[in-house]
A protein has these predicted regions:
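Short beta-strand to alpha-helix junction loop
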Residues: 49-70, 114, 172-179, 208
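Conserved FAD-binding catalytic core of PHBH/FMO-like flavoproteins
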Residues: 110-180, 185, 209
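FAD/FMN-dependent oxidoreductases across multiple families
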Residues: 174-249, 254
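C-terminal helical "tail/cap" subdomain of flavin- and related membrane-associated enzymes
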Residues: 247-320
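Short hydrophobic core segments
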Residues: 84, 92, 99-111, 217
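Helix-loop-beta segment of a Rossmann-like dinucleotide-binding subdomain
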Residues: 42-59, 91, 160-172
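A conserved beta-strand/loop element that lines the FAD pocket in flavoprotein oxidoreductases
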Residues: 72-84
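N-terminal FAD cofactor-binding segment of flavoenzymes
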Residues: 1-39
């Protein structure tokens, strides 16, 4: 929902065990709204910790249309208005009565994916979010805000060409009875009222589920929990998982390789990053429940490198 992805160079630092990043992530120029140069981590005091950060703010519609065209160029059929009603073994039933069969079925439909609902009973933490697109000039620094304005989650301002993507995500159990709408309205109003679009959704924040494969069924992306909880990164992480899944499926069909190789290769490439991110989010969720004045003290030049380790999924260090 935030439309932000790290540059390829940032991805190589964030996910050092992922091979051929440049081959995987080939975002076309027309789908890039802005290139960012900094990330500001902002406590309640408003005094940010500033870090160099190369990011790409996407035109999400253009980006997703490009992905569709790329898939079609490789032989995929793209169906619109095709709602999945049921998945049973090798059969997929649509709401309009059509039925498809396949030796392998991949669920890539987000955290409410119908394949996951049918065959997986593992629950995940989902953070409700609300965001807007707003016209204006907001600089070129990405902002992540922490504290009582977004209990258990964070708020963001991601600048775009001629505007920004601004939003809030919270954990309801820490909201003390206040609604997401109240938190979002209060935060968004800080930046003005030139709203051109408003949206809402939820973000899976438990990290990856225990298994991605059941018989001939695979999950990828948000459906498999492929979001880094400590920073919300999901687009590029899902593309990493999607490539591994695709390569495994080809190997399975051609050489009868076990589909569970998908899970093993994911752990080789992303296991340590995801573990660190889960731990950082768990610790961070506790820290962010502290009073704002303590958070303000915690965000200082001395702690600056350690805060960055939390966000970038490295093993967190804690100083007492």
């Amino acid at each position: 929902c935030g439309e932000l992805v790290p540059s390829n160079e940032e991805m190589k630092r964030l996910c050092p065990n992922v091979p051929e990043v440049d081959d995987l992530l080939q975002t076309p120029e027309h789908a890039i709204s802005m290139r960012t140069s900094q990330m500001h981590l902002v406590p309640p005091s408003g005094r940010p910790l500033r870090y160099p950060f190369e990011g790409l703010m996407l035109d999400r519609v253009a980006h997703d249309e490009w992905l569709v065209d790329l898939a079609k160029s490789k032989g995929a059929n793209y169906l619109t208005g095709a709602r999945v009603e049921s998945v049973d073994g090798e059969k997929v039933g649509l709401r309009d009565g059509r039925e498809f069969t396949a030796r392998i079925i991949v669920g890539a439909g987000g955290h409410n994916d119908p394949l996951r609902r049918s065959y997986w009973d593992e629950s995940s933490l989902k953070i409700p979010i609300k965001f807007v697109l707003m016209d204006g000039d907001f600089g070129d620094a990405v902002e992540l805000h922490f504290g009582s304005m977004a209990p258990g989650g964070y708020a963001w301002m991601f600048p775009k060409q001629g505007g920004a993507n601004i939003g809030v995500g919270i954990q309801n159990k820490f909201a003390k009875g206040r609604s997401l709408n109240l938190f979002a309205d209060e935060f968004i109003q800080r930046y003005g009222d030139a709203v051109t679009f408003a949206g809402a959704g939820s973000l899976p924040m438990s990290g990856t589920i225990d298994c991605f494969v059941k018989e001939n069924h695979l999950l990828v992306g948000d459906a498999a929990g492929m979001v880094l909880p400590s920073n919300g990164a999901g687009i590029t992480i899902a593309m990493i998982g999607g490539r591994i899944a695709g390569q495994t499926i080809v190997s399975h069909l051609e050489n009868e390789t076990s589909l569970h190789e998908y899970e093993l290769e994911w752990k080789r490439q992303m296991g340590s990053v995801m573990r660190n991110s889960k731990l950082s989010f768990k610790i961070g969720s506790w820290i962010m429940r502290l009073p704002d004045w303590i958070l303000n003290l915690a965000f200082n030049p001395l702690t600056k490198p350690f805060v960055w380790r939390f966000v970038t999924c490295r093993k967190p260090f804690i100083i007492f």
